[in-house]
Design a protein with these regions (language model features):
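PLD/PLD-like phosphodiesterase catalytic module centered on the HKD motif
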Residues: 1-243
Length: 243
């Protein structure tokens, strides 16, 4: 059943049959933008592929069967485009994910540690997550600690900085900065809430830039954003309304 309202949905065969029963005055359609077609169709197909893989699983197929279907799709793309490079994009039969990689000269290797020992957030760095403060969820500050030590660069935009909050992650920030990581922070003196001690502690860190706005008349910043850049491409961002 189609509900009245706004859409931005690719018209597939099923939807087309429903639309055929609706008078022209009640519907509005438009061609897919040629410049955006690849993105629009890829997003649509992501849904279709996921449903297909879930169907394989629901019918008793293991991950091997799902990989087989995924590779059939890759093969179809390769055959259609005649680009041999697509052959390298087939999923390996071992059904594994790369989780971490260390440099060849990483000092941790000399201490007996391996890539498996690296701290990583409990939440996915590839999928979106929502923090609600529920008991079964990881605590926000513990996730930030793991994000910090696994990042290459960090940007923070916060309306104010309290020492009571900063002290929970200052050790990780210090370790990050001393290891060559670049830290950039923008904050304000909003409502006089920023603690001088917090700013002084951050100023003492190497590779750190801090910008503080003292314009209390025009600045009404109440956004909180933390961006953890990773050279691997798996950058994560936290956006919310609380420090």
């Amino acid at each position: 059943m189609l509900y009245p309202g706004l859409y931005e949905q690719v018209i597939n065969n099923a939807l087309n049959r429903e639309l055929a029963e609706i008078p022209e005055a009640r519907k509005s359609t438009a061609p897919i933008d040629t410049a955006e077609a690849a993105k629009v169709l890829a997003q649509y197909l992501a849904d279709v592929v996921q449903k297909g893989l879930e169907n394989v699983q629901d019918n008793g197929g293991g991950i091997e069967a799902q990989i087989q279907l995924a590779n059939q799709i890759v093969t179809t793309i390769q055959n259609t485009t005649q680009e041999a490079d697509f052959a390298a994009l087939g999923v390996d039969g071992r059904a594994e994910q790369l989780l971490a990689l260390l440099q060849q000269n990483d000092p941790r290797l000399a201490t007996g540690k391996s890539a498996k020992d690296l701290d990583r957030p409990e939440t996915s760095i590839a999928q979106s997550s929502l923090f609600t403060g529920a008991i079964h969820e990881p605590q926000m500050y513990t996730e930030l600690k793991k994000e910090i030590v696994s990042a290459d660069r960090i940007d923070m935009l916060v309306s104010f900085i309290k020492w009571s909050g900063l002290r929970l992650i200052i050790d990780e920030l210090r370790q990050f900065a001393q290891s060559g990581g670049e830290l950039r922070i923008i904050t304000t003196s909003y409502m006089g809430a920023t603690d001088v001690k917090a700013i002084e502690e951050l100023r003492a860190l190497p590779n750190t830039k801090i910008k503080v706005s003292y314009d209390t008349k025009r600045t009404r910043l109440h956004a909180k954003t933390y961006v953890f850049y990773r050279d691997t491409g798996f950058t994560t961002a936290y956006v919310g309304s609380s420090n």
